[in-house]
């Protein structure tokens, strides 16, 4: 156990002490209990000796392995709880309006004014409530009154509700506020459609895509993730303002949300025609419930990975061949493949477990994105 000196009385105390036993002064600074080096308080492992500063959890294990893949030294800027702590707090209409006013030269803050500790989201929940309120009368109109005019609206609202909600979450945590909302909508609509078409072209090749087999399910995962990653990369190369990890998360999420929404709308209609209204409603519920861990999350990871390997360089084709980018994308491919595999487990345990794993990766990249804000400030000084 390392010893440090109290800043008030100079008495030697343990580096893990919270108060000086001699004078009672609070030890506000953080030190490694193993080697005594001064810390910022956000580190997971000591940067000097590698001593673990947090308890071993599934999250920490995933973080450590991601650090090995990326070569980064991640820090805990925010936790999952921090990101959602303002969800149920009261906000004014002006607060709501301000969230969507960004992306122009006059509404994009300077990097030095961006506080990485303030990453949180709350508008996403309001958007979800709007979808639910709109969905209920369309369902009543079609199911209770048999009016077919309500069917298209019910399908679209049921398919779009959760993907769009998650997309708004990523829009909110893009603290750089350098991507206007109309571009997010563009990436959502065009990205979703283009990635679906690209996937269909791959599916037309003579390869096994039968998800009743393990190899076929894995091939489906590879095809769809390559299609989404290609479109995400295309948008990132075309965008002049998207230079950061949080931007990659957002644009990736937009493409993934579009893919998920359009695909789900098709499944709802197809299964409904084949199995009736009960099957249609069940499809809406199940795909909505599982949507947070699917296409939106996987594509967001791919976008974040590309912007991470780019760093502060100009995005180049060489970054697409970066081993770190390919390995991170492989996570999405494998997750997608396992998701589609014919694995029997009760209560959707497989997709729920994969959702948790995907979001641990997302939180990892959110923290890297917040750390990048501090790094960008240092470059400007």
Language-model segment annotations:
Residues 1-2, 28:
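Short, low-complexity disordered segments enriched in Ser/Pro/Gly and basic
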Residues 4-5, 10:
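A detector of tandem-repeat and repeat-rich interaction/domain scaffolds
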Residues 5, 19, 31, 45:
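The −1 position to Zn-ligating cysteines in a subset of zinc-ribbon hairpins
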Residues 8, 26, 34, 38, ...:
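Hydrophobic alpha-helical segments at protein termini of multi-pass membrane proteins
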Residues 14, 18, 28, 40, ...:
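Short functional micro-motifs and their immediate structural scaffolds
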Residues 21-25:
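Short, intrinsically disordered linker segments that flank or connect zinc-binding domains
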């Amino acid at each position: 156990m390392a010893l440090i000196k109290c800043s008030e009385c100079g008495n030697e105390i343990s580096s893990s002490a919270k108060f000086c036993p001699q004078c009672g002064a609070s030890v506000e600074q953080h030190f490694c209990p193993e080697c005594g080096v001064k810390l910022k308080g956000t580190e997971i492992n000591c940067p000097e000796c590698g001593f673990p500063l947090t308890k071993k959890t599934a999250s920490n294990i995933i973080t450590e392995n991601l650090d090995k893949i990326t070569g980064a030294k991640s820090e805990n800027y925010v936790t999952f709880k921090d990101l959602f702590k303002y969800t149920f707090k009261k906000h004014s209409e002006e607060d709501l309006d301000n969230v969507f006013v960004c992306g122009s030269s006059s509404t994009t803050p300077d990097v030095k004014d961006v506080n990485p500790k303030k990453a949180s989201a709350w508008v996403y929940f309001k958007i979800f409530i709007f979808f639910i309120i709109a969905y209920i009368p369309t369902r009543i109109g079609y199911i209770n009154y048999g009016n077919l005019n309500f069917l298209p609206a019910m399908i679209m609202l049921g398919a779009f509700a959760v993907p769009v909600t998650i997309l708004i979450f990523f829009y909110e945590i893009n603290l750089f506020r350098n991507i206007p909302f109309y571009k997010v909508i563009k990436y959502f609509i065009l990205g979703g459609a283009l990635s679906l078409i690209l996937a269909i072209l791959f599916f037309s090749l003579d390869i096994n895509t039968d998800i009743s087999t393990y190899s076929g399910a894995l091939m489906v995962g590879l095809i769809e993730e390559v299609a989404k990653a290609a479109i995400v990369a295309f948008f990132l190369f075309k965008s002049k303002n998207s230079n950061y990890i949080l931007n990659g998360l957002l644009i990736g999420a937009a493409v993934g949300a579009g893919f998920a929404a359009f695909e789900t709308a098709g499944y709802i209609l197809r299964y409904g025609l084949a199995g009736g209204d009960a099957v249609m409603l069940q499809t809406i519920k199940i795909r909505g419930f599982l949507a947070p861990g699917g296409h939106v999350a996987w594509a967001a990871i791919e976008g974040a990975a590309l912007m991470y390997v780019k760093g502060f360089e100009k995005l180049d084709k060489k970054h697409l061949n970066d081993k770190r980018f390919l390995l991170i994308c492989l996570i999405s491919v494998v997750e997608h493949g396992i998701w589609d595999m014919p694995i029997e487990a009760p209560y959707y345990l497989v997709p729920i477990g994969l959702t948790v794993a995907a979001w641990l990766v997302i939180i990892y990249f959110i923290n890297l994105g917040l750390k990048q804000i501090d790094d960008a400030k240092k470059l400007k000084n």
